[in-house]
Amino acid sequence: MDVALKLLLLAALTLLASAQTPIDYKDLSTTLQEHIDKALEEGNRKFGGRHHVALDSFVTPAVTRQSILNVNVFLKVTTCMKTRSYKHRPECNTQKRSTPKINCLVCKMKNGTELVHCARKIDILHGEHKEIRDNCDVTRIGVSSLMAQTMPDDYRKQVGCLGCI
């Protein structure tokens, strides 16, 4: 039992570490780059001062489908000076000392409009800005599919229904 628990813990830590590894911007899809550019523009506007804000890593895996949009990334203030362009600059990768990580979220809201919101990572961890970010549509893929059917007031498995519970 101890071995299984240790393996499960190791798998969870590996997954957590892989979700926060640095990103190679040029390897991302054009659609994902467009949404990350929106986060970079907002991050530069709010936190950059005279320095460029750059992409650091994903907070969670990005979802960029027509009906669902959720891109959550960490940004960092770099040692590079700001230019007119807010877009990704591969030469700007060194984080400026004594600057916080920035958590930026680009999502589709429940009313169909797009939200671009950036805040310090520590503020997000302490629950600040929750009222803003809770406006994101958190629809999950497959929620309304046949595979997720349940019968109201009847918890028995339904015969002939693939995946009904």
Curated annotation (Swiss-Prot):
The keyword Transmembrane helix does not apply. One of its GO terms (biological process) is multicellular organismal response to stress. Induction: By oxidation stress as a result of either short or long periods of environmental hypoxia. Residues 1-19 form the signal peptide. Disulfide bonds join 80-92, 104-118. Keywords: Disulfide bond, Signal, Stress response. Involved in hypoxia tolerance. Seems to have a cystatin/monellin-like domain. This is Cystatin-like protein. It comes from Clarias batrachus (Walking catfish).
